[in-house]
């Protein structure tokens, strides 16, 4: 829409077709390049008129940026986390900040299991052997790997993602132990997961999966 009466929203990155259709009906948009690590020069030129900012986690919404946006009314951060957004600075200006909690829980848990399976079954090593011509014939112990069934998985951080990993690992017949500073023991019981000190987890686990913030 080019109606100048509609609010101006800056979208930091080019997104797949159709993702912005609903937004397009309610505002004017200026959209940045696909792989931007910072706000493009073109978008910076529109900051004084912007009423909305739609960002990805590579864009720092900090004091320096906010000082250029006197009309800004909302920040929407397309990420579960919001470390890239200065919440205090936004709060002082009365600017609400939105994010997308939970959107990556299943995908991250699936990827965790995929990595664990690849490591346990030495899939990457075997694949490289086959591709590089080193594999010659079958062997009863060639790239044998390790069973997940019966192995102990230690999860550090039993939040949404850690719990989703536990659900999947239980289906593989793994024993689940976890360490968390504020454990939900009732939820853990439902997942057949045992809370243990971190030192015990490190000592007793066959696999360890971390699901905690960097801080």
Give, region by region, the residue ranges found by the protein language model:
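An N-terminal-biased, well-structured beta-alpha scaffold segment characteristic
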Residues: 1-98
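Rossmann-like dinucleotide/phosphate-binding beta-alpha-beta segment
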Residues: 25, 138-215
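Residue-level detector of anion-binding/catalytic polar loops
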Residues: 28-29, 96, 118, 122, ...
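Short gly/ser/thr-rich secondary-structure transition/capping motifs
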Residues: 33-38, 56-57, 132-141, 189-195
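Conserved beta-strand edge residues that scaffold enzyme active sites
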Residues: 36-37, 104, 130, 183, ...
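Short gly/pro/ser/thr-enriched loop/turn and capping motifs at secondary-structure boundaries
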Residues: 81-84, 104-107, 184
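Short beta-strand elements at the ligand-binding edges of bilobed clamshell
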Residues: 96-102, 195-198
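Phosphate-binding beta-alpha-beta segment of Rossmann-like dinucleotide-binding domains, i.e.
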Residues: 101-152, 164-167, 178
């Amino acid at each position: 829409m080019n109606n100048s009466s509609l609010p101006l929203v800056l979208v930091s990155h080019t997104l797949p077709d159709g993702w912005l259709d609903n937004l397009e009906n309610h505002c004017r948009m200026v959209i940045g390049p696909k792989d931007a690590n910072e706000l493009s020069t073109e978008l910076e030129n529109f900051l004084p008129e912007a009423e909305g900012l739609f960002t990805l986690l590579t864009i720092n919404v900090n004091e320096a940026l906010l000082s250029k946006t006197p009309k800004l009314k909302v920040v929407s951060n397309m990420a579960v986390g919001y470390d890239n957004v200065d919440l205090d600075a936004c709060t002082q200006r009365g600017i609400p900040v939105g994010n997308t909690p939970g959107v990556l829980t299943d995908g991250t848990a699936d990827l965790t299991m995929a990595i664990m399976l690849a490591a346990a079954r030495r899939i990457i090593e075997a694949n490289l052997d086959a591709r590089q011509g080193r594999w010659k014939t079958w062997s009863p112990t060639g790239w044998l790997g390790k069973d997940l069934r019966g192995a102990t998985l230690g999860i550090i951080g039993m939040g949404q993602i850690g719990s989703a990993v536990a659900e999947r690992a239980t289906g593989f017949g793994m024993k689940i132990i976890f360490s968390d500073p504020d454990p939900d023991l009732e939820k853990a019981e439902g997942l057949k997961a045992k809370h243990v000190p971190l030192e015990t987890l490190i000592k007793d686990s066959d696999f360890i999966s971390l699901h905690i913030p960097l801080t």
